[in-house]
């Protein structure tokens, strides 16, 4: 049994959970090629459809459906030139824990786009993981499958809670990742101490 099936998922179920846009156009188009409210209402309809979808009860893994506020906020952050499928690529997102990222990378199917962040982003902000995006075609909103080791999940959560949307430079997260790997913190209390130290150094 594969990693997906162990958690109650399968390509077939993901297809059933994929929401087809009602706009009649490929979601590869950029945000500014759609009328703003029509696109937002389409994305919000996807979230509402997922909210009441009984198929999610079959899934034995953490998931979250993006809120209306988050959908609108992401539109504003990404407008005008980002494709819709890269903006609203996580209206439905599943979170997996894995022992090794090779487990996630082995899930190579035509419908999956793999984004390997296990060694960091192009501009490293400390985050580590592997993201898979499931999409039957370009007229459906993608579903995000986020894989992290337990070790990385802990730091990712702290980075999200303390740095996300606060406009700190990526170097802050990168410095925290280095300190984490050096063993300088392993609890929320020691994380906060190291964060304060890193921020004070940035201000000098």
Region locations from a protein language model:
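An acidic, glycine-/histidine-flanked metal-binding catalytic module
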Residues: 1-43, 144-204
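Short low-complexity stretches enriched in small and charged residues
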Residues: 11-18, 45-56, 97-106, 190
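Surface-exposed, low-hydrophobicity interaction/linker segments
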Residues: 32-79
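Long beta-strand-rich cores associated with HINT superfamily self-processing modules
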Residues: 85, 90-92, 97-193
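Hydrophobic alpha-helical segments with strong N-terminal bias
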Residues: 9, 77-79, 115
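Short coil/turn segments at secondary-structure boundaries
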Residues: 59-63, 83-84, 94-95
């Amino acid at each position: 049994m594969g990693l997906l099936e162990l958690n109650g998922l399968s390509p077939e179920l993901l297809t059933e959970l994929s929401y087809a846009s009602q706009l009649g156009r490929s979601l590869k188009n950029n945000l500014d090629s759609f009328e703003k409210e029509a696109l937002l209402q389409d994305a919000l309809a996807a979230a509402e459809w997922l909210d009441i979808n009984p198929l999610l009860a079959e899934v034995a893994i953490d998931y979250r459906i993006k809120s209306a506020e988050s959908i609108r906020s992401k539109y504003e952050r990404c407008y005008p030139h980002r494709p819709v499928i890269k903006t609203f690529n996580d209206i439905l997102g599943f979170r997996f824990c894995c022992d090794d990222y090779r487990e996630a990378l082995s899930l190579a199917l035509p419908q999956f786009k793999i984004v390997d962040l296990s060694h960091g982003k192009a501009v490293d902000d400390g985050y580590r993981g592997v993201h898979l995006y499931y999409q039957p075609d370009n007229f459906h909103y993608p579903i995000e499958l986020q894989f992290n080791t337990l070790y990385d999940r802990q730091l990712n959560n702290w980075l999200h809670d303390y740095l996300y949307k606060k406009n700190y430079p990526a170097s802050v997260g990168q410095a925290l990742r280095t300190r984490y790997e050096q063993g300088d913190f392993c609890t929320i209390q020691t994380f906060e101490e190291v964060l304060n130290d890193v921020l004070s150094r940035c201000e000098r």
